[in-house]
């Protein structure tokens, strides 16, 4: 389930004038008038909103206790001080825990790659290690091109999922390097650390390039068998079109 990530309309400051609300930089070159406002997690109002948000959606949908929160995805935080980043993430988790004692915080790590100039390890580490590792799960978002676990000391022991993206913004295309994906997965199983938790996909659109997604997920279920890529390809063709005719 999604949870409250602190992004609020700027008009909220009229209702709560004492709340610590910061104006973040505009996203992706948009004019500043469209920039996002951010309710500081250290403000007590953040916990109030989070609790109400989770209570409401749990009544509607139930819960598996896993909550997606991406605070600064493609956004600059109010401060790059490591101490601040650590305090922010710790407070976000504590607000989650007050709303659901079994809460697990799920977040993608695309920000660590997309803003890699700023997300150095001295900032990444406090951001993801300031609360219990077993209460969070990271999605290594774009592993076929950039495995962030390799840049961040295996996420300093925090559980993560190796994810195949393969699709930005719902683009339709038939493309993918199966051999390289297999190589990367084999290496992750061997060297990714005990906190490597599973294989997933972060595709941004459905019904495109089923070949690659079939391979990734079949690899997850039957890891050793799918090392023979030509054999897997022939089997997939048989499943889709029937057996090849000897003639």
Q: What residues fall within each predicted segment?
A:
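Catalytic-core regions of glycoside hydrolase
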Residues: 1-246
